[in-house]
């Protein structure tokens, strides 16, 4: 038998390897194609195309514990014309069975999600938004305004090392930075998990925060009076390390950036200067004298100019041009200390708490065009597309200035945001107390003296509703909107993180025309995330929406069931119950009493109004307090 040639011996292994590589590439391509293959549903002349893919290129499919982008492309069935300006809603719910749900079951699921009851809630609500309050205590309240278990809208509390002074949220709503002056630290919060993931030592008394437009660096004011510790600390947002502590001048610092992030403008209150900083080199290029107390700074995209409010003499300085010099001075009155420039528009706004006036100036001509009287102690201004909102610390009334009427007889209206003036609260914050709501033409207003948040819609005489902050002073507000957004024409997207692997139903609803459908999503196991340990039992309240009266004994009845079979767990003698008042200022422990057929009972007297959590523990069931899902009870004043 002839021996194979040397050339054949060499080529055969190479061909085998090539075949293997091509096979692996084909498999990989198949997986990627499968992940990206859209699911399509057509009804009522509308075509909805759903895709889900991992946000990170590291993964080929959606995996537990990692972010994924959900995308709904909505077009007309005939011609594929993108349908824009729609308001689709969607929910994700983990499937309990292997079978796909029917169209009827899908409609019933959507209907249950639209109800306020918590008998049936989705794993993830893609229509929710959260209100965050920066409190007088060392914590942040997270409030779910659209729902609430047992009457409570408090979703969670984020503990801090000390009270927060200022905060800034990234554009993708995933990371929140909070300055903590009493701790000399910056807290870094992961929004999807509501956890503080890092605490960074950033020097003495960090107060004001400013995040560049590209979010590369976070700039922190170290307000240390006239001491040598007065500086600006710069943090790299990728490494979460301090890259520079820049000495610009003494006193309080306000910070603004040019649109391209090439320049930073920093006020130095005690030194009476503005520093112009080269961001790339992190070096001071120029110091500009301002006069007594440069109190605020803002950059205009329209005029490419930085404006500085000088409280000492009431001048608004305009810094611009290639040499970064003073190109105009706008005269107002001593005490001007707040600046606001809406994202679109031709005017800037300067507030004077001493004179209770707002000075409106033209960004093109750098001339004063109007002076508007407002409430006493006006210290903050916020904007919607139609109005400027002015908060006054000396009054519960918020002043509204119609932007379209600037330069004419300004249409000024007021509405009450509470019963008491904000100044009656002990602590204030530099962060905004008035923020736009997700709904157009609406705002949320924090009143720390009332311990309430008010929801106001333009055109109304009074707020349409309110949310309590559970005995905490809300000094500032943020809104985190998780709803679907139109990212391109006819494409509505959001980013989510599902921590548990499995199959999910993606319930979709379009109101007009009425389209309901349930798509499917598979979340794979993540080798980097430990599997969730399931408890052997589940506990369900007998009364789904429990409201107690403070000072009156309240009976809590609940069922203990086998998590897999649903069979009642009877005659448990070691079922320990822990009841505590959030945030842990009162608690009670007791053993539950069996009243038959897997139903147990305990009771307690709520000492005051608030949110109470009920946890369970049983040695015989291998259940610890931290493994049980708590029941939530709202206690109200009797």
Regions found by a protein language model. Give the residues of each.
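Predominantly soluble domains enriched in secretory-pathway, periplasmic, or organellar proteins
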Residues: 34-513, 517-522, 533-555, 563-571, ...
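Edge beta-strands of extracellular beta-sandwich domains
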Residues: 516-525, 624-635
